[in-house]
Amino acid sequence: MIASTGLLCTVRDTDGRVRVRVVETPIGTQLDRLVKLDDDVQGVLAGGYHGGWLTLAAARRMSLSNADLRPAGATVGAGVLVALPVSHCGLAETAQVARSLAMESAGQCGPCLNGLPAIATALSAVAEPRPAEGELASLRRWAGLVTGRGACHHPDGTVRFIASALRVFAAEIAEHSAGRCAATRHERFLPQFPAASLTECDWR
């Protein structure tokens, strides 16, 4: 039987430059055969922005399959695999994407209209040096309120992405609480998309 294949986009830092590749690969291929996972990688995003972050150690053990990824809070999802270098802040990267995801909604139900902006705001605060007391608790509370309650699964995917960042970058949360950040480079690494305010002429 011929193994099923899929298209995968991989993103990695190579000599200080972001390298993006698109490859066709069998489902079930080990992740470390698809993107180089050496010690300058601090975390791996599997499945895109509705997927989840993995620790480097976990990613080295896993394959491109939902059977492997889902128990760890990630998915094959959009077929995106990003190796985040240690030079960048995983919290800041995730917060930037969360702000965009909060705007990528139809605004038709409370979890998208109110919940995702509140989550993005709280995560942005946690990603700053010395966040105000209670911001992390507020973030977790909002995430719990939103999960499973949207008219679609956009809130669920967004919360999965953010919750995985809180697990994988827990040490960075502690650094930020003490007024420090381990990042040495501050330009954005994750691919971004523009987010504009919803207006009366929006497609809705």
Enumerate the language-model features and the residues they cover:
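Redox cofactor-anchoring modules in respiratory/redox and cofactor-processing assemblies
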Residues: 1-204
